[in-house]
Amino acid sequence: MDTTTSTVESKKQPIQKRRPLLLGIGALVANLQPSKLLLAEEVVPDKYRAFVDYIDGYSYVYPSDWKEFDFRAHDSAFKDRYLQLQNVRVRFIPTEKKDIRDMGPLEEVVSFLVKHRYAAPNQRPTIYDMQEKTVDGKHYYSFEYVLTSPNYSSASFATIAIGNGRYYTLIVGANERRWKRYRDQLKVVADSFRLLDI
């Protein structure tokens, strides 16, 4: 009986040693590219492409016929090939805050940003909609607004969030005359913005 017991135990030892090794390898592989695994769960809508920045920690989708362009002081930007005023852009700045809610209540934050940061002195701002959403434990403020000047008006969606020690802003917009036609398409872009852990 002693030989049977020792034989069974010796057969279990290699299996028991392999299990932690396999679990460790699995955890390592899963941690190498957590953003790709996260993005793979989401389906990119038809006629859109995904933009994923693994270094700076964010992702969003944009219309597949748009092209990349340089927009001063922004990390990424895409615009319509033919309608130059339709574009999406993302920028971020460092912050000590941990969550967008640390900035204040939704209504106060959005009102301040639109009136004092986004609008030029000659523009009249109008806020149409604002909402807070939580995705994977991260909080986002999204809002729709129009900036009207004597000669020109633009409409936009903005999504703001805080994570990775950064305050992120995504703005997607168009000329107000085209807004009704393209609004739903541009809302998909604004709603797709996600922070990735870096």
Q: Language-model segments: what does each one mean?
A:
Residues Y62-P63, Y128:
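Extracytoplasmic/periplasm-facing segments of secreted or lipoprotein envelope proteins
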Residues E41-K47, D56, E68-Y168, A174-R178, ...:
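Conserved polar/disulfide-associated segments of primarily extracytoplasmic proteins
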Residues D2-T4:
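N-terminal intrinsically disordered, acidic low-complexity segments at the extreme N-terminus
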Residues A27, L37-L38:
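Cleavable N-terminal signal peptides
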Residues G165, L186-V189, L196:
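Compact beta-sheet-dominated globular domain cores
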Residues Y62, V109, Y182-V189:
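Stable alpha-helical elements in mature extracytoplasmic
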Residues T7-V29:
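N-terminal secretory signal peptides and thylakoid transit peptides that target proteins
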